[in-house]
Swiss-Prot record:
Keywords: Cytoplasm, Cytoskeleton
Organism expressing this protein natively: Drosophila melanogaster
Gene field: ana3
Record note on quaternary structure: Interacts with Rcd4;this complex is recruited to daughter centrioles before their conversion to centrosomes.
Location(s), subcellular: Cytoplasm, Cytoskeleton, Microtubule organizing center, Centrosome, Centriole
Listed name of the protein: Protein rotatin homolog
Role played: Participes in the structural integrity of both centrioles and basal bodies and in centriole cohesion. Participates in the later stages of centriole assembly through the interaction with Rcd4 leading to the centriole to centrosome conversion.
Length: 1977
């Protein structure tokens, strides 16, 4: 990069004068030169030196020469001059009138040329002059577009459209601008939309507009000069440029979407300080509405045809909806309505197409249907968006809008994902019952019914009966006789099951009634035919005594009311009613009556008791049968025969009831016979003598036959008076009358008066209702009726009683039913009728009562009318009535009603539309897959013809199968013979892709790529080929943008393998047209951003180099837009693995720095250029930083400090650019360059003195600037952190103080914005979590550089503020990632930095803050839920180590682990994954676990984390399989521990706790942790990479340490280790090492390579031995297998030579042997044995260690070395086995006491320190317990030692115990007895005084231990054998023993607790008794 500014270009005066040269050639050459320089400078924004007035004059004078050459170019230069910044000079010098006059002259000169372009330029120039001279200016909004006026011929509509757009904009369509451009950017944008009038140039200019659009924030286009609206205006042009305008609009919308998302991001926020009156912009929603309206105007004429513009318009509509979604804004109803109207129009067309030729139908439907599908999806998305964003949406209206989509079966079936989404949408729109539920119900019914017509899905028997309602819903609609037969067959087939399944019987009854009641006569006739067949068969089986149904008795069936089919009164009633209907055929009418006749004829076949079961079936329909019998003689005879008293098998009650019906018969003879029979029955009744005689006056045969014939019938309305709406007023009267009725002893006349008054009162309907509420009301009336007919009673009350009964029966239907089934009431009423036939009123009332009782199930009575549900004519009924046929709803009627409702609500009662919908639905249900639908597959079904699919329907289905139609387009493309046809086909394919996106089938996608590749592989050869090539490029861009794998992989492979591909050739063509280059670049960018796999080949590097060269070429040719296209590609290529050397990376970095500098501006114009260059630079820098190997990168650092300074200076200048993204990339580049330069930066920083305070101060200033974008503030902070080590701690601290950073950071915490998205309205300044992170990171860095500063930091309020931030974490709702990262990565890291020097601060603050600790656990949970949280978990682990160190916080964690064990397990296990091996994350995890295990060893078992984890049960999967770093274990109880441990209702006793000796029912957490550690151990040690010659890795050491500590602390882990054979693996590893021939013998190896090189082996051995030592220090780690013990012993012996080279290894190994023998008897045996191939056993080596460590000389005044203690302990342990004792005896170890415990010590003897001597005495004490070690020796030394040692000292006690042990062996008795010093010693011991109480003598002992040992020795020596007893009796010693015994006995007898607190007192007393007893024997 050159640091010098290039000199400004100039147009010399002499050069300008050449414009008026006489030579035409000179004039033209001068014009070319001036035009090139002038225009280029204007485009690049570079200054140019010239005289504007002179240039203008010369250009005007140009037209003085005839003929005028290239007038359009000269006028264009004048226009550019007037628009440029140089126009001011012209305006000042030349008045408006003069300028206008000169232009008039030019117009006259050019008048003859008739050039459209020239006239347009002159018109525009006139308008421009008005603006420049402020002459008659128009409003800003109009002027912004009027300056870009379009010629009148082509764009009169455009002008009107432009004006209309602005006229329609209202104040509410504007909003405050998000940001606003500077004047230079406004001028540039004006020039961008100052489009030429030539269509070719216009298209080129639009392409440039798309390329340059990225320079500006998209909101600029919604502000003057309103670029967006100008593009909308250009859509109305008719010059063929619509496709380019739409492409620009699509690009603008996508940029707008990106801008909206960017503005929502917190990192893009900066505190605004704009005034409230800042500029306005058109609202995005308003702009989208304008665009959508314009698009719909354009697409309406094209809905039924396909042009090159269709797909762009449709894509625009889709992008509009997507922009609304990104904006989170509702879509205005006007926009939705526009789409809905188009959807309706297209659907109406598609549904109306008719024809019989499939080809013609498909041609008519293909494009309209395709666009219909697109708009269906758009409408669907619009309504779905409004549900989310419009809370006040009219859901009913929204549902009406999408109703056409819901009914588009072809659309939903072809797009199942849309169907699912639409169902969800409809359910969300339905707040209550929805008409769509009816449609869904019908469709489900059709589906079930159609399944019945398919053999594979047909239901039979009970299953079909259970589903009958769904089938019957559509039975009539389908008109299928097959379904009717299946349903009836199911009813008959299930007859055997009805007895045991009442629900099935009920369903069968309902089904049969539904079938009988079918409205379709054809289907009903079929049912009757089937019923006749079944019923006759059953009846004949009675006659022939055969079986009707296998397994069922005929009589049993009839008892179940089954005669051929199940029967119910309702079914019979319906059949009888149908027998009288006019539309029923005569045959069917006859059959309807034959059925009950057949049932009644069973009277002659069945037993009486069986017929009595059958007759109740007929009783409810008996009124109807008798009514029909009037005109049906056979029926009359059958009924009469059944009721005949002499032959009837019925009960008399039923028989009497039947004859009463005939009293209403129109035939007098029938009535007479019935009356006579009734009278006869009444006379023959029992207890007849109790009542008044019925025939006392008239003989029976002379009784009138018209007793119940009331002519005319009594008017029902006169029974009850009309009541008002008021409440019943006669309540008191009714109560009084009722009380009188209840009285028993009232007179008859009073009772009659009472009944009469009550009768009158009950004419009120409400009074009847009140009377019905009386408890005994009905009973009193019935008693009155009964008493009135008794003999001897007054009959005066009979008439009012019957009248009251009549009214009450009408009023209460329940009472009526009860009375109708009471036989006594019939007899009472008939007696009254026969007693007083002459009383008309009584006869009338009785007749009406009988009518009510007989017809009770047929009548419904109200206050003003009586209704019968069937026509009872010709019976003569006694009261007037109305007939209302009661329709019982069935599934069929419900289905028909549903069908009508759906037709009304969904199809607007358009039957044709509804029929088509159901035809399509039937076809889809039958054929399942749209592609398999054929006319033949549906025509074979037994359904109505109107429901079978037609040819037009099939065409609609096929046109909806987009993959199939797209395949047809490929065929059409192959058959194209013209370029235009091919282009049209490609446009159609693009239209298909608008809706299909990336959901193409593999075959279609592959064919699509083949088509594209065929035409883009070679470069076009002519103009026609060029157009096809561009259309194919456009198609290729679409495919790759939709991420179609075939296109992506295909193009990638083609570019990699085909070096002559058109892309390769055209990209290197410097003359390539801009539009073609732009399309190629779009292809490449989409490819690079969507490529599925990153090839390992070097294709990207080569491509990068080629593109860089091409960009350079274009730049040299000043083809700047070409360069922009290339830079966009390079941006993506730079992200790939370029495989460049460091030198290449540095070279290209400098190249792009120079390229960036060549077009540097401070405004938005050209910012995309800068972004691309800087992004490429950043990527190259990243490659350079992370290049391998690292050392080579240092060589690429530029040695020239000056060059690095220039680069840094350049980046710093761009840090002040107007574009925020440029600034951000500049800071990133700056940081990367600082990293690359390393130490050079320290030399450069002082030279950056042009920055106030230098670069670090500039970084801090930017960081604290609230008006800067958050991202840039963060980047500046990161750069400062990079610079801190370079400027030093003191300078950094000084800067922090100067900027008061701690205070600023604390204040920023108050306004922290803790979400990643910004609110819609921000009040006051905000600070992102990332900015806060920078503040915290600076503090952390400062503490690391200057630890003593941490104290000052801890005293600042910032630390408490950070604690409060941590407390903001919510345990329930998931927090934002930036907040989690701030807390986990920065705040926790800062707190952990305070541990070293300021732990007390942490203990006093966060360790005691329970809220902080609780949020710390919440933070762990949030971090673990992220995808890549490794870098965030490390600070959390550091904090965990701190909390474990503090007792208070450690207790809190232990308590929390009880409630959240799974959280802690996730925390621990995540870092133990093998993928994280050797990572810092894993190392900290292992450290944390080691601390947990260590604390478990120190703490009580019940109060440690490990103990709680052992209680936590979980299911554990294979530990070797894990995905993405997550552990595959599943907690049995989420956030809870095992139920058997923590169930609140369970007992907390020991029985409920887990114990190691219990069977493991579930894997606990300790075992899981062990498995993870074991897996890591295997990864370290069982891999081929293991080498003992290399130092062990840190992780390797930590894993072994953690394993050892876990196995020491956990019994469960020990068991798991046994199962996984961990010990065997360790032994195998050590064995392999010892067998390694490369190493061999230890001494030889060390001698060969030197001691320093053997340290790696020592270290590896130390790691394993230390793990084993920790492990086996636990008493639970017992080795019981002999083979394992032997192997370990052999390994330890073989390792022994290495111990001489490491004192620490020797110490640890001896300790391991000590622990092994401590807990394992087998180990003691194997250590004692001599192993094969070895001269000494391991026990011998231990003895040598003990001997060496004892006898070696030690430095005076130094702590004694106790390394012999473990060795002696091994010797002690081995004493337990015979082998060990034998080996020890052979070593003569007791000879050591000659050295360490001489009998007569002198100065020449070895001085042994007391601890060493005690250790040896301890060994001797144990060894002397056995015969091989109990030999009496060194007696004098022991005695002397005892005498020299103070009483009760450890050494003295050990010596006494050794003597005691010697006394136990008889071989030592003679010598000991004869040893006077020994006896005297015992006497002296017994003479010692012992304190008996606290006040006893002060010099006394506090224990009887020595006395006990002395007495024990005396007992063993003298208590056995007369000789020895006699020797003792003659000594003073015996007297001492007696005195001691007496003293002890007296003391214990007088005061039991005298020696209770003195040790060994009781033991001594017992031994004295035993001794004395022995002496007495």
């Amino acid at each position: 990069m050159s640091t010098k500014q290039s000199p400004a270009l100039q147009l010399a005066e002499g050069q300008l004068t050449k414009l008026t040269s006489e030579s035409e050639e000179i004039r033209m050459r001068a014009l070319d030169q001036i035009e090139t320089r002038f225009i280029r400078c204007l485009q690049l924004g570079e200054p140019i030196q010239f005289k504007p007035v002179l240039l203008l004059k010369q250009l005007i004078r140009w037209f003085g020469y005839t003929p005028p050459l290239v007038p359009d170019r000269v006028l264009a230069m004048i226009m550019e001059l007037l628009r440029s910044e140089y126009a001011e000079a012209v305006i000042r010098k030349i008045p408006y009138e003069r300028f206008k006059a000169e232009l008039q002259k030019v117009r006259r000169v050019l008048h003859k040329q008739e050039s459209k372009r020239v006239s347009e330029l002159l018109d525009d120039m006139n308008l421009l002059l008005l603006e420049k001279y402020n002459i008659d200016r128009v409003t800003p909004s109009v002027s912004s577009l009027s300056s870009n006026d379009i010629p009148s011929q082509a764009t009169e509509s455009a002008d009107s459209s432009s004006n209309q757009i602005y006229d329609n904009l209202k104040p509410e369509d504007y909003e405050p601008s998000w940001s606003h451009p500077c004047l230079d950017d406004v001028a540039t944008m004006k020039s961008m939309i100052d489009l030429p009038r030539n269509s070719v140039e216009l298209q080129l200019q639009l392409t440039e507009l798309i390329i340059r659009m990225g320079d500006y924030p998209t909101e600029y286009f919604l502000q003057p000069p309103f670029v967006f609206l100008h593009l909308v205006q250009l859509q109305t042009m008719t010059d063929g440029s619509l496709i380019h305008v739409n492409r620009a609009l699509i690009a603008c919308l996508r940029l707008l979407q990106q801008r909206i998302l960017l503005r929502r991001n917190t990192l893009s926020y900066a505190d605004r300080f704009d005034p409230p009156s800042r500029p306005k912009q058109v609202k995005v929603v308003s702009a989208l509405v304008i665009l959508l309206e314009n698009c719909m105007k354009l697409i309406r004429p094209l809905l039924f045809s396909c042009t090159n513009d269709n797909w762009h318009i449709m894509e625009l509509i889709v992008e509009i909806v997507r922009t609304h979604d990104v904006l989170s804004s509702k879509i205005p109803l006007v926009s939705i309505t526009l789409i809905a109207d188009a959807v309706k129009s297209l659907l109406a067309y598609c549904n109306s197409v008719e024809g019989s030729c499939m080809t013609q139908l498909m041609d008519s439907l293909r494009i309209p249907r395709l666009q219909s599908l697109i708009l269906n999806g758009v409408l669907h998305d619009m309504v779905a968006l409004n549900i989310n964003y419009d809370k006040r949406m009219d859901r009913r209206q929204a549902k009406a809008l999408i109703q056409p989509i819901v009914l588009d079966s072809a659309y939903l079936s072809g797009m199942p994902e849309r169907m699912k989404s639409l169902n969800t949408l409809i359910s969300s729109l339905d707040s209550g019952p929805s008409p769509d539920e009816e449609l869904i119900k019908l469709k489900r019914a059709y589906s079930v019914a159609l399944n019945q017509l398919h053999p594979n899905t047909e239901l039979t028997g009970s299953l079909l009966i259970q589903k009958y309602r769904q089938v019957c819903l559509v039975l009539v609609q389908l008109g299928s006789e097959t379904l009717v037969k299946q349903l009836f067959g199911a009813v008959v087939k299930c007859i055997p099951f009805y007895a045991g399944n009442l629900k099935l019987r009920k369903d069968a009854d309902e089904l049969l009634y539904t079938l009988v009641d079918l409205p379709a006569l054809k289907l009903r006739s079929l049912i009757y035919r089937l019923m006749i067949k079944s019923t006759v068969a059953h009846f004949h089986s009675f006659m022939n005594k055969t079986v009707y149904m296998t397994g069922c008795s005929n009589v049993d069936l009839i008892r179940q009311h089954i005669l051929g089919v199940p029967l119910t009164p309702l079914l019979l009633r319906r059949m009888i009613i149908q027998s009288s209907e006019a539309n029923t055929s005569e045959r069917m009418q006859q059959w309807c009556l034959d059925y009950p006749i057949m049932i009644m004829k069973l009277n002659a076949i069945l037993a009486p008791q069986d017929f009595s079961v059958v007759f109740p079936l007929l009783l409810p329909v008996l009124p109807l049968l008798i009514s029909r019998s009037v005109t049906h003689k056979i029926l009359h005879n059958v009924i009469w025969n059944v009721l005949e008293p002499d032959s009837s098998r019925l009960d008399p009650q039923l028989m009497l009831r039947g004859y009463v019906y005939f009293m209403f018969h129109p035939d007098g003879e029938v009535r007479s016979e019935a009356t006579t029979t009734i009278a006869y029955v009444l006379q023959c009744q029992e207890q007849t003598n109790r009542y008044l005689p019925t025939a006392s006056n008239v003989p029976v045969e002379h009784i009138a036959n018209d007793l119940c014939i009331i002519q005319p019938p009594f008017c029902y309305r006169s029974i009850f008076i009309k009541c008002s709406d008021e409440r019943f007023q006669g309540q008191r009267s009714l109560d009084a009358l009722f009380r009188l009725l209840q009285a028993k002893d009232i007179k008859s006349n009073i009772r009659k008066s009472t009944m009469t008054q009550l009768n009158v009162l009950l004419r009120n309907w409400r009074a009847c209702e009140e009377f019905s509420t009386k408890e005994d009301g009905y009973r009193l009336i019935m008693e009155s009726l009964h008493n009135a007919l008794k003999k001897g009673n007054d009959t005066d009350i009979l008439l009012p009683t019957v009248s009251i009964l009549m009214k009450l029966l009408f009023n209460d239907d329940e009472f009526r039913l009860e009375v109708a089934n009471t036989f006594g009431v019939y007899t009472l009423l008939l007696r009254a009728l026969f007693l007083f036939p002459h009383l008309e009123q009584l006869r009338q009332d009785v007749s009406i009562c009988l009518f009510q009782m007989l017809f009770q199930n047929c009548i419904t009575s109200t206050e003003d009318k009586l209704v019968l549900n069937a026509n009872m004519e010709p019976l003569i009924l006694p009261v007037t009535y109305e007939i209302e046929h009661k329709v019982i709803p069935t599934a069929v009627t419900e289905g028909l009603e549903l069908q009508q409702n759906v037709e009304a609500t969904h199809f607007g009662r358009d039957r044709a539309k509804a029929a088509q919908h159901w035809r399509l639905y039937m076809a889809y249900r039958v054929c399942q897959v749209p592609s398999s639908i054929t006319l033949e597959s549906v025509s074979a079904l037994d359904i109505r013809e109107s429901l079978k699919i037609k040819m037009a329907d099939l065409a609609l289905v096929r046109s909806s199968d987009l993959n199939e139609q797209l395949s047809c387009q490929f065929i059409a493309a192959e058959n194209c013979s013209k370029h235009e046809d091919l282009q049209k086909t490609v446009s159609a394919i693009q239209l298909f892709l608008v809706v299909l996106r990336n959901s193409l089938s593999d075959t279609v996608a592959e064919n699509l790529w083949k088509l594209i590749h065929k035409y883009i592989r070679l470069a076009p050869g002519n103009e026609a080929d060029d157009k096809v090539y561009k259309s194919m490029l456009d198609l290729c861009v679409t495919c790759i943008r939709f991420s179609q794998p075939h296109a992506i992989n295909g193009l990638s492979y083609a570019l990699e393998t085909d070096h002559h591909h058109s892309f390769q050739l055209l990209l290197h063509d410097s003359q390539i047209s801009l539009d073609k280059l732009f399309l190629i670049c779009q292809c490449m960018m989409q490819l690079l951003s969507n490529e599925l796999s990153d090839d390992s080949m070097n294709w990207y590097g080569k491509f990068f180099m080629q593109l860089s060269a091409v960009a350079k070429t274009h730049f040299e040719l000043r083809q700047l837009q070409h360069v922009r296209c290339i830079l966009c590609m390079l941006r993506f290529v730079s992200e790939r693995n370029l495989k460049f050397s460091n030198a290449q990376l540095m070279s290209y970095s400098q190249h792009f720095i120079q390229l960036s500098s060549n077009l540097r501006t401070s405004t938005q114009t050209g910012s995309e250029w800068q972004r691309d260059c800087l992004y490429i630079i950043c990527q190259l820098q990243i490659h350079l930083i992370y290049q391998e190997p690292k050392a080579s990168s240092k060589a690429s650092i530029p040695n020239d400090v000056g060059a690095s300074y220039k680069v840094l200076r350049y980046f710093l200048t761009l840090c002040g650019h107007g574009d925020s993204e440029v600034r951000a990339l500049s800071w990133v580049s700056l940081a990367n360059w600082i990293t690359i330069c390393g130490s050079q930066v320290a030399e450069i920083l002082p030279r950056l003195d042009f920055l106030p305070g230098g670069l670090p101060a500039c970084c801090l200033t930017t960081l604290t600037d609230a008006h800067e974008m958050m991202l840039i503030r963060e980047l500046a902070g990161r750069v400062f952190i990079l610079l801190m080590p370079l400027i030093g701690a003191e300078s950094s601290l000084e800067l922090l103080r100067k900027h008061d950073l701690l205070k600023t950071a604390y204040n920023s915490l108050k306004a922290i914005h803790d979400t990643p998205w910004m609110f819609k309205k921000i009040v006051g300044e905000r600070h992102s979590c990332e900015v806060i992170s920078c503040y915290v990171a600076i503090c952390t860095k400062m503490v690391a550089m200057k630890p003593e500063w941490c104290a000052a930091l801890c005293g600042h309020s910032l630390m408490s503020g950070l604690s409060d931030v941590m407390k903001k974490l919510k345990s329930q709702a998931s927090c934002s990632i930036p907040l989690v990262e701030l807390c986990a990565s920065q705040i926790c890291e800062l707190y952990s930095m305070c541990y070293t020097n300021n732990f007390e601060f942490l203990k006093m603050t966060i360790c005691r803050d329970s809220v902080f600790l609780q949020n710390y656990l919440t933070l762990i949970n949030d971090v673990l839920s992220l995808e890549c949280p490794e870098y965030m978990v490390i600070p959390l682990l550091k904090m965990f180590l701190i909390f474990c160190t503090d007792s208070n916080s450690n207790s809190f964690l232990i308590e929390q682990i009880k409630n959240k064990p799974s959280l802690f397990m996730d925390f621990f296990l995540f870092g133990l994954h093998v993928k994280l091996i050797n990572s810092p994350f894993q190392r900290f995890t292992l450290s944390a676990l080691s601390l947990v295990f260590t604390k478990a060893q120190l703490a009580a078992y019940d109060i440690s984390m490990l103990s709680e984890l052992e209680k936590f049960e979980l299911a554990f999967s294979d530990p070797d399989i894990a995905k993405d770093g997550k552990q595959e274990f599943e907690s049995k109880k989420k956030q809870s521990v095992s139920q058997c441990i923590y169930d609140e209702s369970s007992d907390n006793s020991d029985d409920n706790k887990q114990r190691p000796n219990h069977a493991i029912q579930a894997t606990n957490a300790a075992i899981i942790i062990f498995h993870r550690l074991d897996q890591l151990f295997d990864r370290y040690y069982l891999s081929k990479a293991l080498n003992f010659l290399e130092l062990p890795a840190v992780g390797q050491v930590q894993v072994c340490e953690a394993l050892g500590e876990l196995l020491k602390a956990s019994t469960w882990a020990v068991k798991a280790a046994g199962e996984s054979k961990l010990l065997g693996k360790v032994v195998h590893i050590l064995d392999d090492f010892l067998n390694d021939e490369k190493i061999g013998n230890a001494a030889v190896y060390v001698k060969r390579v030197g001691p320093h090189k053997a340290q790696s082996i020592i270290s590896n051995l130390l790691v394993l031995i230390n793990m084993l030592s920790q492990w086996h220090s636990s008493p639970n780690s017992e080795i019981i297998q002999t083979s394992m013990a032997a192997n370990i012993a052999k390994i330890l012996i073989r390792i022994w030579p290495w111990l001489s080279h490491s004192y620490h290894l020797k110490k640890v190994t001896v300790q391991l042997i000590m622990f092994l023998t401590e807990h394992s008897f087998e180990m003691c045996k194997q250590i004692s044995l001599l192993q094969s191939g070895h001269a000494q056993s391991l026990l011998h080596l231990m003895a040598r260690v003990a001997d060496f460590e004892t006898t070696k000389k030690e430095i005076p005044n130094k702590e004694p070395s106790l390394n012999m203690v473990p060795a002696l302990r091994v010797m002690v342990n081995c004493c337990c086995c015979t082998e060990g004792r034998l080996s020890l005896s052979k070593m003569n170890l007791l000879d050591m006491f000659d050295t360490i415990l001489p009998a007569n010590p002198c100065s020449t003897h070895l001085k042994v320190r007391p601890p060493v001597l005690i250790a040896w005495l301890g060994f001797w004490e144990v060894f002397s317990r056995y015969d091989v070690g109990g030999k009496a020796c060194h007696l004098q030394s022991l005695i002397n030692t005892i005498r020299r040692s103070p009483p009760l000292s450890h050494k003295r006690i050990l010596c006494l115990r050794i003597l005691r042990n010697m006394c136990f062996f008889n071989g030592n008795r003679p010598r000991l007895v004869e040893l006077a010093d020994f006896i005297n010693l015992l006497r002296d011991i017994l003479e010692q005084r012992v304190q008996k109480a606290p006040t006893s003598e002060k010099n006394g002992l506090n224990s009887f231990e020595e006395h006990r040992l002395a007495v024990l020795m005396l007992w063993k020596l003298f208590g056995f054998g007369a000789k020895y007893k006699g020797m003792l009796r003659g000594t003073k010693l015996f007297k001492l023993l007696i005195g001691l015994r007496v003293e002890m006995s007296v003391v214990f007898s007088e005061e039991e607790n005298k020696y209770a607190g003195v040790p060994y007192a009781n033991d001594l007393a017992k031994l004295l008794e035993k001794l004395m007893e022995s002496m007495r024997q």
